[in-house]
């Protein structure tokens, strides 16, 4: 596998450091005439799927998403990795904190675009769950960045880019989220209570 890019970090403070929770996008090293990409299979293991670029059933016009026999796939798989800094400029990998990988059928293509909300109860991570089933918002809670509680999908498809407010307003929790269906209503930022 090769890392194709680092994207959309969630930023927070922990243990007197500045941390980034990076989205890491990976794919297999590509071979001539073949397009290959990773997915999580039903057993939760990474499986590499490959198609011939010459196949009449392949539409690879978008470098991020391909379609084969009418079924869509992402060309990379994303997961989340922590890096830290004492000065906010120079960051280093923290091996004692494991990456956060996709899990289950709603995260077959991985997890993306994480936001980190710091609360008195720890850290709440909202992120995009990506699969052939749907694109929606997932939620994870942690206090120590080693143990996680997964709450599953909290905003239904097609939805992404969720940010929880870190403090209650009028005794209630709020979040911004983005239903993203240009065909039905457009791309707007919504406020959820």
Give residue ranges: language-model regions.
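Beta-rich carbohydrate-recognition and catalytic domains
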Residues: 1-109, 117-163, 167-193
């Amino acid at each position: 596998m090769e890392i194709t890019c680092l994207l959309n970090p969630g930023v927070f403070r922990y243990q007197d450091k500045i941390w980034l929770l990076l989205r890491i996008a990976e794919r297999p090293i590509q071979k001539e005439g073949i397009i290959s990409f990773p997915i999580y299979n039903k057993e939760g293991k990474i499986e590499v799927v490959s198609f011939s670029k010459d196949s009449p059933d392949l539409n690879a016009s978008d470098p991020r998403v391909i379609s084969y026999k009418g079924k869509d796939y992402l060309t990379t798989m994303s997961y989340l990795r922590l890096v830290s800094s004492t000065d906010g400029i120079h960051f280093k990998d923290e091996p004692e904190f494991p990456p956060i990988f996709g899990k289950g059928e709603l995260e077959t293509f991985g997890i993306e675009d994480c936001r980190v909300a710091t609360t008195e109860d720890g850290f709440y991570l909202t992120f995009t769950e990506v699969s052939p089933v749907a694109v929606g918002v997932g939620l994870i809670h942690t206090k120590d960045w080693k143990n996680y509680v997964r709450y599953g999908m909290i905003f239904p498809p097609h939805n992404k880019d969720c940010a929880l407010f870190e403090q209650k307003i009028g005794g209630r929790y709020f979040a911004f989220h983005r239903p993203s269906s240009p065909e039905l209503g457009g791309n707007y930022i919504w406020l959820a209570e």
